[in-house]
Amino acid sequence: MEEPAAKRPKLSDRSEPLTQRDVVLFQKEALFRQLNRYRAEARAGQVQVEELRRAHGQVGERLAAVCGVVRSVARAVADARGDGDARALCERVAGGDDDEVVARAAEFAAVVAGGLGRGAAAGEGWHRLEAVNSRLAAENAQLAAELGAVRGFYAELLRRYDRDESETVRRVFKVEESEPPRAATPVEESSAKGAASDGEAATAVVEREMQIEELQTEIRVLEDTVAQLTDWKRLNEQELTKLRQMASSAELSQRHPTPPSSSNLSADLQVLRSKVEKLSHENKELAQLNEAYLGKFQQLSADREIFNNRLSAEFQTAQETLKKHNSNLEKDLVRIRTARDELLSKVAVLEAQKSKSDMLEDLEKMLALQQEQLKALSEHKPEPARDAVMKELQDLEKAFKELSQYSNKKYSEYVNQESLMSKLTVEKTKADQKYFAAMRSKDSILIENKNLSKNLSKSNELIQQLKDIEKSLQAKIENLNKQLHISRINEKRLLDSNKTTSLKIMDLTSQLSKANKSSTLVQQECNKLIEEKAKMESKLNDLEIETKNLATKLTYQENKSKKLHKTLVSNGGDNGALAEELENFRTVVYCSLCSKNWKDTVIKTCGHVFCADCCKERLAARMRKCPTCNKGFSSNDLLVVHL
């Protein structure tokens, strides 16, 4: 169901300032102009894409055919050539796809040229054709650039024409127009009728002039085309004559090839035989060297095993001897320490006993002296004062006894203290002896530890030396293994070269016929490529002619548009039909509620189309009726469409 046609919006008066409605209408017309421009570009792009697809298909077919011929030539050349690199390249070209063939075209051409060794005249003609091709390609690029510039100028001219014819542009930018017509009086009406008839006559004259100019333009285009075709025909005849001469010279060279002389073949055979003999002699020498290296390797392996066994046995013997010597030294040290402690204790006891005996001897001497004095006193004769003396003596005796008891008591205490001191001294002496013995044992242990550390360091040095010797022997063994591997590789290489040489000798006799076949195929391929080049040049010439015709038509259309514009301005013609069509298009495309968004949402209950924003606004405001037919709808009745 189509929307009812909305009324055409009116612009505000020019004397008044711009309104929001004028700006919106200006933006809408700008969008329509841009849309028309994009449509024109899209149509031109579609035409170009179709033409390019057709040309691409033709080029793909021709490329496939050319690649097939090149693969066949590569197979023939691979059968003819005996060297490894060229044969491998030909096999890759023959077995690869089109991309592989194109990527290795230059290398394959060099191989074919080296195998043929002739065709200098054809090569010169090919280079000349390549120069002509490059020149035509440059001219084609230049013409394509000119055509693009002309198209851009024509598009810009159309855009300016659309903008100049737009009322909104004139309203926004305040372009001055001619004075509007006043109310017509009867006299003015009659004069207007006469002017209208005169305008129709002038329009007819302008149309006849435009037709005449169009015919003259077509005549000039046809004359230019005929001249270009004549020049192209003359150039093609010259190129055809040159190609026929080149083909005849190539056929003569193929029919009468210069066969290789027998002397050259015999010389090549002699050289190959000498190479084979030299390689066999080198192979024998390498075999002898290989055997000598194997013997040296086995001898070194046996020597290394013997040396390792002997060294390990000596190391074990020295280690056991050192352990036994250390155990004997420890036993002797314990025995010496025990004897020393016993002797020290005996010496201390003897020293204590000696001091006690000396003291007893002194006391005995004192007692003996006192007894002698007592005896001497008792032996004296009595005197007159005997009683007093006796009494005094008794007192002295009593005092002496008390003194003796006291001295004995003190002596006993002293003896006890002396014995205690002697015991403590003995204990202290024993403790000192034990301390000094411990210190001496510590020193001896430190000395033994130092000796053991020295022995251990010497053992580690010996082990490191043995490891270094083992590494050097391992390196020598690896070098011998590498030399053995190299000698085996050389032997294998010599055998392969021997086989390759024999194969080359067998292939030398068949290369001449295969080379002739490959040259024939290459000549056919060259002829096909020349035909393809001629077709491409003819197509390029057609494009040049078409470009010139388009340029001429463009000039004619520009002149025609200018004249039509002048006629329209002078006659004051109305473009109401075009404006009405544009307004109808706007009504169909834009939403009838806001007149600014595209129609993209349809109401399924009635089929009317609006923009999504207006539909959501009406649902949010609880206005759930169609603005056109007042049918109710909900959010589930909305459907997104693409116009």
UniProtKB/Swiss-Prot annotation:
**Matching Pfam families, A to Z?**
BRE1, zf-C3HC4_2
Q: Is Acetylation set as a keyword in this record?
A: no
Which Gene Ontology MF annotations are present?
DNA replication origin binding; identical protein binding; scaffold protein binding; ubiquitin protein ligase activity; zinc ion binding
Going by the UniProt record, its keywords in alphabetical order are: Chromatin regulator, Coiled coil, Metal-binding, Nucleus, Transferase, Ubl conjugation pathway, Zinc, Zinc-finger
Q: Which residues does the annotated region (Disordered) include?
A: 173-200, 246-267
Stretches of the chain forming a coiled coil according to its record:
200-233, 262-406, 446-494, 520-555
Q: Where are the zinc fingers (RING-type)?
A: 591-630
- Indicate the enzyme's highest-level EC class: transferase
* Family per similarity comment: Belongs to the BRE1 family.
The protein in question is named E3 ubiquitin-protein ligase BRE1
Naturally occurring in which organism (per UniProt): Eremothecium gossypii (strain ATCC 10895 / CBS 109.51 / FGSC 9923 / NRRL Y-1056)
